[in-house]
Design a protein with these regions (language model features):
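Active-site-adjacent structural elements in enzyme catalytic cores
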Residues: 1-325
Length: 325
């Protein structure tokens, strides 16, 4: 925890004045604004280049504050909050009156979570309100997991950056729609489907597609500058070396099954065998291959179970079709 108490107090003052603060969470760094200040929330969208229809997540200091932000707290939502907060779980519920439509993309629902990071929790306590925050990066690009990532990408557009060190989880929160009787996962993340089912006692669905009612649902998202190509694990070396021969500067995500295999490429990332370590390092790996000048990244998807589901989701979207410029 690098941020001092004086830094956190200053950051809280910035939020009260309508400014933007980048702050660490256990998942990624957030770009925060006073959730009840429509002008400050609008500036978040402006700085990120984020479409106004894409809702933000409101970060609160504890589960006891949830009822202040939503119309009602169903029993299922209360159960999940008690088990997973603070932590990488976001609940989508009916919007309460104090939430401005600017923070919800005009929807009648709101996304809320309690982050599990000492700096974030101290900031929320010092500020005394909710902080609306997406990831602290340009819309569609790789999420930041260090304060330096934020500074490099957003620079002076952020009024204050709190440095809390590298993020422990490394991928965004799991988003659960808890508005109905049976919850569903709208975005996989740091809390696994298996974790949720163990608490709920019944299976939950993970839709293959989603409308833009939660963050991270654009076809191309979490994307580095380099193009990302997905292949089967056994074809990674062949495809990477072919692309290198054709003149690309190729970066390779080498899976554990090929850890000792030689590969002719511009840069190689050895994918950790631990899914927790992979999630923690994923965005840093993508940024590093960009930094090393790769224009093409060859990767495969992990098994889509546990944290592998969230990792596969992020890599698949990083490889998604990009808007024409």
């Amino acid at each position: 925890m690098k941020a001092r108490n004086s830094d956190i107090e200053k950051a809280a003052d910035v939020l009260r004045a309508g400014g933007l603060v980048a702050f660490p969470t256990e998942t990624v760094y957030g770009l925060g604004a006073n959730a009840e200040d429509p002008a400050a929330v609008a500036r978040v969208f402006q700085v990120k280049g984020r479409p106004p229809s894409h809702p933000l997540i409101i970060h609160i200091g504890g589960a006891e504050h949830l009822a202040d932000w939503v119309e009602e707290v169903p029993a299922t939502a209360r159960l999940l909050a008690e088990r997973f907060w603070p932590g990488p779980l976001t609940l989508v519920l009916r919007r309460g009156r104090r939430v401005p439509l600017e923070a919800t993309g005009g929807l009648d629902t709101v996304a809320v979570r309690v982050p599990d990071h000492p700096v974030a929790l101290t900031l929320l306590s010092a500020f005394g309100g909710g902080v609306a925050a997406p990831s602290a990066n340009r819309f569609g690009s790789v999420s930041p997991t260090t304060a330096d990532h934020v500074r490099v990408e957003l620079g002076d557009a952020v009024n204050f950056v709190l440095d809390g060190g590298p993020c422990e989880v490394g991928v965004e929160s799991t988003i659960v729609d808890a508005t109905g009787e049976i919850p569903s996962v709208l975005r996989p993340g740091g809390v696994t489907r298996e974790d949720l089912e163990a608490v709920l006692g019944f299976p939950i669905t993970v839709p293959s597609t989603s409308h833009v009612r939660v963050p991270g649902q654009h076809p191309s998202h979490y994307a580095p500058r380099a193009w990302v190509v997905l292949v089967e694990p056994e074809k990674i070396i062949t495809e990477a070396e072919l692309a290198q021969e054709l003149g690309h500067q190729v970066g390779v995500f080498l899976p554990p099954s090929l850890a000792d295999a030689p590969v002719k490429a511009h840069a190689v990332v050895a994918v950790p065998s631990s899914m927790a370590a992979y999630a923690r390092g994923l965005y840093g790996f993508l940024r590093e291959l960009d930094r090393r000048g790769c224009d093409l990244i060859v990767a495969s998807l992990p098994a889509e179970e546990g944290l592998g589901l969230a990792i596969a989701n992020r890599i698949r979207r990083a490889a998604g079709p990009r808007p024409s410029k």
